[in-house]
Amino acid sequence: MSGTDYEFDWDDNKAAVNLSKHGVDFKDAMTVMLDPLAMTIFDVEHSQDEDRWISVGRSSGGMLLLVTHTFVTTGPSSALVRIISARGATRHERQQYEQGTSQ
């Protein structure tokens, strides 16, 4: 997702609940989009009303996070990302990320 200018949005109430539940601030979660090694997949299971994506990558603070978000292209090199949730990556997700970055 590099080479793209991102604008970020989220629901402040959802961000507060996420911080309390998972200990991850959406301001940290948005930096995952800047990780050139981040992996992003389409979230088929949760995309009934809107297209949702799941990204696993390192935040600017070094945390490996899983971020659920929407992604809407707004121009040739710009996008709006709405963060839905964020949490620390599980052991399995960490292994997938590390395998993907070592290839």
Model-identified regions with their sequence ranges:
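Ribonuclease/tRNase effector modules and their secretory precursors
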Residues: M1-Q103
